[in-house]
From Swiss-Prot:
Self-association state and partner proteins as the record states: Component of the ribosomal small subunit (SSU) processome composed of at least 40 protein subunits and snoRNA U3.
GO biological process, one term: maturation of SSU-rRNA from tricistronic rRNA transcript (SSU-rRNA, 5.8S rRNA, LSU-rRNA)
Family: Belongs to the UTP25 family.
Name of the protein described by the UniProt record: U3 small nucleolar RNA-associated protein 25
A Pfam family it matches: UTP25_NTPase-like
Amino acid sequence: MAPPRGRAPRGRGKRSRGPVGRRDAFQASRVDDIESDDSSSGEDGPIDEHMEEGMAEEEAMDVGSSSDEEDEEKSGRPYNELLQLLNTSTDSKGPARKKRKVEHKNTETIEVVREDPVAEEDEEALGEDDLEQQEPSDEEDNGNQEDAGAQDSDDEDDNDPFDTHFTNPTEDELAKKIKAIGENKWKNAKKELPEGLRLVRAVPDTGDDASWLPPMKQISSVKLKRKLKEPASDKFPQISGQAQHIAPYIFGYQDVLYGARTPSNSAQMRDLLALHATNHVLKTRDRVLKNNTRLAKEQDSDLDVRDQGFTRPKVLYLLPTKQACVRAVESITRFFQPEQQENKKRLLDTFSAADDPSWESKPDDFRELFGGNDDDMFRLGLKFTRKTVKYFAQFYTSDIIMASPLGLRTIMDQADVKKRDHDFLSSIEVVIVDHADALLMQNWDHIDYIMKHLNLQPREAHGCDFSRVRTWYLDNNARYVRQMIMLTSFVTPEMNSVFSTHMHNTSGKVKATPIHAGAITELPLPVSVRQTFTRFDCLSPAKDPDARFKHFTTTILSSLVRDIASGRGKASAGGTLIFIPSYLDFVRVRNHFATSQQTTNVSFGAISEYTEQREASRARSYFMNGRQSVLLYTERLHHFRRYQLRGVKRIIMYGVPENPAFYSEIVGFLGLDPAALVEAAEGGVRALFSKWDALKLERIVGTQRVGNMMREKGGDTFTFM
């Protein structure tokens, strides 16, 4: 049985892009008598190795941002303890304030820091911090919460999606929608847009139709915090392109799966999401401060204020690299415009890096993903006050958590059961997953794990004031109110599973996918190339790997071996590239080449994401020079390295790639040697597919063609020129 896609691990380290090189190299050639190893154990080995490494390093780390401040805190404890004793003898009214600003005549502000040892120890213990118990900002300290809230508050609007979705949902209506979702009853609507986008909207079936929201062309129509309106208007004088059709559902707190992310529209989508996340955090804080003031004024009344969750973090970002995290932070600060950013230098020093100038020839999507610091092991907490944003805040004092799936899971799934913690995800109200296709190439199992632990009831109170917890939290219905937004360059079965399994928003959900012209129409070659797609029958996804392997060895490989044998000694005998999307399929085919009688006279090389750089270079050289007739090549290796393989005269695709850009790039290998271009065009491309490859195949051959190729009864071979 084939493993779920994206299960291969990623290693830790500063340069985590590309083959991690943790497996022993494998070289096999019947002609050259190159030794083979026994690295066909699948993917469990590297996963355990990297996870154990990450867990070991995290055992001493508090649940918080990537770089903890434990050493710094310890160094300050003796002084703080002495200070506490002095304060006890001189001021018995209470602990010293943590921060206070002193205004001088020259208008310079000097910040005097007096640490409260008790508060410090509470933070170390990951204790008791939620929105009500947040550390006071300068204006909120000393009873000035009313003034602080008034300066930056807005009148509540019954039409504000924040209030209608989170604050004032009707309990009866909410119960009806949750019941419909639990019974998987949805009303659906579909439409196509002139921008080449297909939309599918689903709402809980409570009698209402799934209507469409009008396009959002002006950001002024969004109910924004007063502080955000001006910078938002400056950044978005108008919303253009596909974003204007997606924005209404984002700001309307509906679940969104957007499958048309590109390097050209990613910045606009990132800014929209940053504005939405910041707006949500500020409104949450504003409601809490207002209610604090009301409760302080009316202490003798029976006010029932429900404005909080169990813990403070409200927004979760899942991102592929540290540089992607920095870009998201920059988008947030562009709108929030804080007067002070604590630990910003530390953030830039540890999360940001310059682009590699040698990558100018790489594709745009590669440079966007791997440019700068491409480390995929990180987590970062952001804490907001009225004028300040603090980076590297502990999770239980953070408003926004940004992390890679690997970085977050190492905290949640530590080897020591007692240290495992996921309570900080109990009150997440907005989840943003950007560049999900890149996360698929890391390890999708981490995504699944995190999704399953969202909005669970916390195991500890963490200082929660349960009298102010919203009712739908107490009823364990937070997952039905939570908003999830996922951006990806293409939609896969794994992402569709998230859409159907974890997107249960009572306000509805939307999936947007592009109408594909097909990668076969955009080949970077000056001549036409024969492209043949062969369908094989398979009854279920579980049987796909065996059926694919049987068809490959009995039909395609037998023909390839005959051609190589008949052309031995001729230039045409070599140059066959076999592209294999799955690593486990790669291992299976590689072992067959190494041990089967069928391939006794075939010299071959094999390179994957685990092959050492030196071994990969040697295999590429042998293949280019004709010393090896066949080269096995994986999709994840191409994703991380984007090699330009020379010497390719024919291409066999064991399966079509997930990323349609890879199809064009790999077929483009045929044109790297102009002298052999005509011969390569005759050799062409041959690809295998089954009905379970429908999503991938649609991106390769186009939306209009894929239906006939799946249903065709008259034959199973389709050729395009």
